[in-house]
A protein has these predicted regions:
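Residue patterns forming the tRNA-binding/recognition surfaces of aminoacyl-tRNA synthetases
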Residues: 12, 16-20, 92-242, 247-249, ...
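Long, His/Glu/Asp-enriched segments that create or flank divalent metal/ion-associated functional microenvironments
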Residues: 443-480, 485-489, 495, 744-748
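Conserved oxyanion/phosphate-binding beta-strand-loop segments in alpha/beta enzyme cores
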Residues: 1-37, 67-76, 100-107, 283-325, ...
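Long, charged, mostly alpha-helical binding arms that flank functional sites
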Residues: 4, 225-230, 364-367, 372-400, ...
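Secondary-structure transition/capping motifs at alpha-helix termini
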Residues: 64-72, 92-98, 114-118, 145-151, ...
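N-terminal catalytic cores of NTP/NDP-binding nucleotidyl/phosphoryl-transfer enzymes
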Residues: 26-97, 124-139, 246-247, 314-351, ...
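Helix-rich, typically C-terminal accessory recognition domains appended to large enzymatic cores
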Residues: 80, 145-157, 161, 251, ...
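NTP-handling and nucleic-acid-processing catalytic cores
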Residues: 2-14, 50, 136-364, 466-468, ...
Length: 803
């Protein structure tokens, strides 16, 4: 190719792919299928940066290869467009989120198409489209019908800036995941999804999917299943029970105090018995100003207040013990109260030291004057457990003791909490519930879905955190579908995670208005064969979507229990300064700028070549230029290709390259796949020629990475059809074996020389040749050979000593 005009070439092939529908999946159930999935983008006003390109390029390469291998490939794209950023922009500018969202989607679509992604654009969906969120609401109502949706007053994570409730997942580190403001605790009426009822199913499902170990571990840790015991402590001189959960019931004899969450309802119930209630109330007010993150930090001063006049009784020994309140105990975790064993829990030990509370050791080991002993050992000071030195046995004995006396039982707890599922904002799916003074909470009838967002002029939430929808009387006021009485609509909306919890199902049948997807199509396409996405979503979106899917499986709406057969991750593209790209740092690289200067194929190739796909790496302009030169050299191969068949000198390298690129793509080792093609190109240039058949092979290998150039070269070769749908090259394993290999020679453990031998050389011959090497003789002349060993393909090992 005399002139590699990437601008003309790339537009030409993008237009042809679109015109011919090259990448459309077809619902032909007789074909082998491959469903490749990426995390769909949130269409922000800033547009995409090159990090987005990397996020989509890994699965892009895999899907292009699968298509060339004869699979019916579904590789779709969507836009996760509900959420606070668009609404905050609307509040600031007065521009409706619908207008902003449509503009941003148009911008993102253009960027994606200019890169040349092989998406099936006929299946694009948008979570803000009523045809889509109708089914989001339908799934919500199915959960409501099956008791997985409930409303409760609770202390929740609340962002004063966004004026909305946040889930634990959206407020990690005590910061709002949306605006990064500090989160506070606030008592509000909250919609919850009972995700905890699916905790065991979510854990069990991990055994049946191909997820990396670190992703499985993060999900397991987030769910946080523990086994232990529920134990009932009575409040002195009352019939009241203070119920706690512990993973170490064997240490009950070491309990010397209890701690309740400042919000615990028993405090108010027995306020008349608590003589220092003023001090308690003051402390409770201070706790209310702290985030959950601040309250649960391990490394902080221990604060609290003793409840004077209120004590508990240790059920295993009858001892009266004090009760404190402290910020590190949360009402939403466990039972809102804990038993404290300061001898064997460091946080309890710190608290006991701060408040002068007794410390009773019940497990031998350590020096409890200096710190808590958290290891195993022989039980002491524990009545019937004394002398037992097996933790499991001690726990079983105590569980039996508790059960016999009716003061406790074996139990299971989870760190994961039920999912706070509402926002007091406008730009989200309306929650399809009606509040009737007679019937209570009533579902919007299915035939009235979608419940559409009304037009509003003011997007500001109310000062008390009410949704903007609460201001619209025509939306709020309605009739109860059960009894016909005047009623009120729910005015909260769903969180952004709602639409992304099932989008992979809608891709399968995006235009169906009778159901979210046809059962036969679901049976054919599910599960997703390979899902690639960011590591930041493995404890939020990935858990949420698995939960929704498993629920749909349980009610017979989908054919498989797990949505994703395989999941993989990727590293970030950092700025040239080595820091994560962000607009505020000014280190964002716009893919459009790279495409204008170097071309989409260069961008695609560099993104895949810059580092191991799973690693984060800085953007380097020099690397981009290097990939541009590589593609220019590839383009020039057209000028030297002639004839058919194989070139003897290239036979080995061509087969090796096909083998390596094929395997590296499967392993997501895209950088080494490209490196192998670069090595092959160097050998071709050293030989000075190649056949058209060999060029055809090379082009097909490169096509998933640089498809525009490869399509142009394919056409110039006179090949039929498109390179993107041509057959993936095969290789001959026998041709992948080197005729000659280089091996090392060690003398007394140190490498003294290297030499080339036939790959199939016999051991005796290899050893004999090694002994004749001049550099080896320097260390063996006059010496006695004690050991002679040939490790095939690697080395000759000689051990000598003076004669």
């Amino acid at each position: 190719m005399a002139n590699y005009d990437f601008k003309t070439i790339e537009k030409k092939w993008q237009d042809r792919w679109e015109k011919e529908g090259t990448f459309r999946a077809i619902d032909d159930f007789s074909l082998p299928k491959f469903y490749g999935l990426i995390e769909f983008p949130y269409p922000s006003g800033a547009g995409m940066h090159v990090g987005h390109i990397k996020a989509y390029s890994g699965m892009e390469v895999i899907c292009r290869k699968r298509r060339m291998q004869g699979y019916n490939v579904l590789f779709p794209i969507d836009f996760d467009a509900f959420g606070l950023p668009a609404e905050n922009y609307a509040i600031k500018t007065g521009t409706h989120p619908r207008i902003v969202t449509d503009q941003n989607i148009h911008n993102f679509t253009g960027q994606l198409k200019r890169v040349g992604f092989a998406f099936d654009w006929s299946r694009v969906v948008d979570t803000t489209d009523t045809d889509y969120y109708k089914w989001t609401q339908w799934i919500f109502l199915k959960m409501f019908e099956h008791g997985l949706v409930f409303r409760d007053k609770a202390f929740v994570n609340y962002c004063p800036s966004c004026k909305c409730v946040l889930s634990n997942e959206d407020s990690q580190g005590g910061k709002c995941d949306i605006c990064h403001s500090d989160v506070i605790q606030k008592s509000k009426d909250v919609w919850f999804l009972r995700i905890t009822e699916y905790a065991d199913k979510l854990l069990d499902g991990l055994k049946h999917v191909d997820f990396p170990a670190n992703i499985k571990a993060q999900q397991e840790n987030w769910i946080g299943r523990s086994t232990g015991a529920f134990v009932n402590f009575t409040l002195s001189e009352t019939d009241e029970t203070l119920r706690i959960y512990t993973t170490r019931p064997d240490t009950l004899f070491g309990v010397t105090f209890m701690v309740m969450a400042p919000e615990h309802p028993l405090i108010d119930k027995y306020a008349d018995r608590i003589s220092n209630m003023d001090e308690v109330e003051k402390y409770r007010i201070e706790c209310g100003k702290k985030t959950e993150f601040e309250r649960t930090q391990l490394v902080k001063d221990k604060t609290g207040v003793k409840l004077s006049g209120l004590t508990a009784v240790n059920p295993v020994n009858g001892k009266e013990i004090p009760i404190f309140i402290s910020d590190y105990v949360m009402m939403g975790y466990g039972t809102g109260a804990i038993m404290a064993v300061p001898a064997h829990d460091q946080r309890d030990w710190d608290f006991a030291k701060a408040f002068g509370i007794d410390i009773i050791q019940v497990i031998k080991g350590g020096d409890i004057e200096k710190e808590a002993y958290t290891g195993d050992g022989e039980m002491i000071n524990s009545d019937f457990l004394n002398g037992t030195d097996n933790k499991k046995e001690s726990i079983e004995k105590m569980l039996e003791f508790l059960k016999e006396r009716g003061i406790g039982e074996k139990g299971v707890q989870y760190k994961m909490k039920d999912w706070a599922f509402n926002r007091q904002r406008y730009w989200g799916e309306p929650i399809p519930i009606i509040h009737c003074p007679h019937c209570g909470m009533v579902a919007v009838p299915e035939n009235e879905l979608p419940l559409k967002l009304p037009d509003v002029e003011n997007f500001e939430p109310g000062e008390g955190g009410e949704s903007p929808l609460a201001k619209i009387a025509s939306f709020v006021n309605c009739t109860c579908p059960k009894c016909g009485a005047p009623a009120k609509r729910e005015t909260d909306t769903m969180p952004q995670w709602a639409g992304s919890s099932w989008y992979f199902l809608r891709y399968i049948d995006p235009h169906n208005d009778k159901c979210f997807a046809d059962k036969d199509k679901l049976k054919y396409w599910l599960p997703v064969d390979w899902y690639n996405g960011g590591m930041e979503h493995v404890t939020r979106h990935l858990i949420y979507s698995r939960f929704w899917h498993r629920f749909l499986y349980d009610i017979g709406e989908v054919p498989v229990p797990e949505p994703y057969a395989k999941r993989s991750g990727l590293g970030l593209v950092l700025g040239a300064d080595g820091v994560k790209m962000s607009k505020s740092r000014g280190n964002v690289v716009d893919p459009d700028d790279v495409i204008k200067k170097y071309g989409a194929d260069t961008l695609r190739t560099y993104i895949m070549f810059m580092s191991d796909y799973s690693a984060s790496a800085p953007w380097k302009e020099s690397g981009v230029k290097g990939c541009k030169r590589f593609l220019e050299r590839v383009a020039s191969l057209s000028d030297i290709a002639e004839g058919t068949g194989t070139t003897k000198k290239l036979e080995s390298i061509m087969n090796k390259t096909v083998k390596k690129v094929s395997q590296d793509i499967e392993d997501m080792k895209f950088n080494t796949a490209i490196a192998a093609m670069m090595t092959c190109l160097n050998e071709i240039n050293d030989v000075g020629t190649l056949t058209k058949d060999e060029l055809s092979v090379f082009i097909r290998l490169l096509c998933p990475f640089a498809p525009h150039l490869c399509e142009e070269m394919w056409e110039q070769l006179g090949e039929e059809g498109l390179c993107s749908t041509a057959k993936w090259p095969d290789y001959d394993e026998s041709k992948c074996v080197d005729d000659e290999i280089e091996i090392a020679v060690q003398v007394n453990g140190r490498v003294r020389d290297r030499f080339t031998v036939p790959a199939d050389i016999e051991a005796a011959d290899a050893i004999a040749r090694a002994k004749e090497l001049d550099k080896v003789k320097e260390f063996t002349d006059g010496m006695a050979f004690i050991k002679e060993l040939y490790v095939p393909g690697k080395l000759v090992n000689l051990v000598v000593k003076p004669q």
